[in-house]
Curated annotation (Swiss-Prot):
The lineage of its organism: Eukaryota, Viridiplantae, Streptophyta, Embryophyta, Tracheophyta. GO terms for cellular component: membrane. The active site is at D658. Glycans are attached at N83, N128, N228, N279, N329, N339, N452. It catalyses: L-seryl-[protein] + ATP = O-phospho-L-seryl-[protein] + ADP + H(+); L-threonyl-[protein] + ATP = O-phospho-L-threonyl-[protein] + ADP + H(+). The chain crosses the membrane at residues 473-498. Residues 1-28 form the signal peptide. Residues 292-328 form the EGF-like domain. One of its GO terms (biological process) is response to other organism. Residues 534-817 form the Protein kinase domain. This is Putative receptor protein kinase ZmPK1.
Amino acid sequence: MPRPLAALLSTACILSFFIALFPRAASSRDILPLGSSLVVESYESSTLQSSDGTFSSGFYEVYTHAFTFSVWYSKTEAAAANNKTIVWSANPDRPVHARRSALTLQKDGNMVLTDYDGAAVWRADGNNFTGVQRARLLDTGNLVIEDSGGNTVWQSFDSPTDTFLPTQLITAATRLVPTTQSRSPGNYIFRFSDLSVLSLIYHVPQVSDIYWPDPDQNLYQDGRNQYNSTRLGMLTDSGVLASSDFADGQALVASDVGPGVKRRLTLDPDGNLRLYSMNDSDGSWSVSMVAMTQPCNIHGLCGPNGICHYSPTPTCSCPPGYATRNPGNWTEGCMAIVNTTCDRYDKRSMRFVRLPNTDFWGSDQQHLLSVSLRTCRDICISDCTCKGFQYQEGTGSCYPKAYLFSGRTYPTSDVRTIYLKLPTGVSVSNALIPRSDVFDSVPRRLDCDRMNKSIREPFPDVHKTGGGESKWFYFYGFIAAFFVVEVSFISFAWFFVLKRELRPSELWASEKGYKAMTSNFRRYSYRELVKATRKFKVELGRGESGTVYKGVLEDDRHVAVKKLENVRQGKEVFQAELSVIGRINHMNLVRIWGFCSEGSHRLLVSEYVENGSLANILFSEGGNILLDWEGRFNIALGVAKGLAYLHHECLEWVIHCDVKPENILLDQAFEPKITDFGLVKLLNRGGSTQNVSHVRGTLGYIAPEWVSSLPITAKVDVYSYGVVLLELLTGTRVSELVGGTDEVHSMLRKLVRMLSAKLEGEEQSWIDGYLDSKLNRPVNYVQARTLIKLAVSCLEEDRSKRPTMEHAVQTLLSADD
């Protein structure tokens, strides 16, 4: 072979090798072919654009060196200023890095977003991507994956973030959740409620309540119909928001109704739903419809303990005895100047401050009718958990408050008055009591632009920056091609790869801003967890899914580290599933802090819960912790709230499949926290939770449909919850009464029939004989009867007759009044 030809072939091989190291980058077009990628280094040019030019899709810089993969309106005033109007994001709360991140339509047909280290941050939901040929950005703003016949296999319209676009269906499975500037999900949800009514919901761990339609009016007065279970809505091209729950064909109509206007329906971080219309001449946006015309009616606007009032503009203030937690972010609300706890509570050192024409909506411990002001006061002051009470003059209605959320003032004609409980040592001035006064001459404006701001460090670059830009990898390829012989090229290639395969711990530790953004959920190296657990020295427990060890992280957080066993998923799928679980946050669910996926190691890092499992306390012989009635009822309620959140509220609904006392942990205040949720997916024993067939749960807690091989739904958790209720009441493990699965089911059927017969009568003396002999008296027999009745309904053979966990929560709350 002639030398020039050999040199040319050698150069071509070298270039091919280097180019093969990186995914194919797609240029600006509406189609992403199978096997192609959009790469973050070329984010300004490597985009998809709808055929009519209205929408673009690609990497959007949310912070320095931090990107989301998003869809945006192409021609707007904001886009020209590089502040694009985002209508959908794959990873709104988990940005990827500015180097080596890519969105790839893989050869198997799935679309995956990977971070700089190759970790899958997001992937398209679905199980069947057979025959996929391309991804396409449609003129509607819908990003779709299509097969060879042009059929849609997946679409972004099915998983909206904070915006609905015209022609996009609003269904029972879709919801809007705003993203704050700190890239965390907001506290508001727009979705169909369980009454099939399109609703705005304020949702935080302590409370979840609807504020639109107006909860103080009945639905019919608001033009809504709760008797249509269709749950279907849509924003039309003309600016009409129609929904199946709107009575008599009503609809919400834009002020500029008509065709030819570009629109978007967005749930903003302040909790208001707004319809925006674009001005074609300059690309600016204007509000053409708003759900909440009075901002103070938005629940939680001023955060916990805060009060919204008009002076005359909407303003947030703290009540007497409270101070602003973060002046730049009112969603954090107010904190008590003097914090009182139940272990040091002395009602003689407490007093009440009257806040006229004021209310904290919801969070009532109970509702009492026709009682005196003194009686209402005595009820609250005798309860260390009561923060204050609302009292209505004339009707004698009394509402003791467990929490102080959604505070607001009303016109002077309103009869609602809050009596705030404060230590006697806290001084109070009448000038500090918030009031709505349209004649106030010095209004303190509610700065909506600062409502959700959180100062964050910019993301630092993981590489040392020099003259290289987004084409740095091609630069190395050409240098190697022209200056390095074949033998030295091989050595350089190995160095090139290994240099960048840094250990995860080294990469994370070197990036303070990046680590800060992902500190709520991050990846740990195996070496970090070996150190944290002191080589897995202290075992906390073990089960079918793995062994749990106690550990302490470098930031002194105490954690539980679980070594998962029998994980057969690939690394990318495991990390993608965990990215969903890591976003789940509820006060009755154990918080997942992170994971390790290194080689064959699969570990979960979660918060350490001090008092261990309910099983240890409930069933251990000679235990030194005895649960009183109040504690047991609170555990039943807390577990119900946690399961209701998994089934109905979190962004991706989760079936636990193994609810039992071992998976219910108790913190220092004996508040229950459910653990091991989401492990059905992680352990890959049956695939999707919509079609689980191999996970069998634990003997004594498994629902009949497991045995019948029926499709598994959330009702399996309801059944297991019913068994847990029986064990809470009796203090005895059901499975120990008999042996074998069939015998347990047979015994439970007899027990359910016996309890059902007892519940038909008015007699209550039999309840004492059924309850745990170790139970400290007194017992609230109304609550006991409610728990027994709920357990019986949860243990129905026919799963369609079992209640939902949301219904269970409401049942228990009504008994708690």
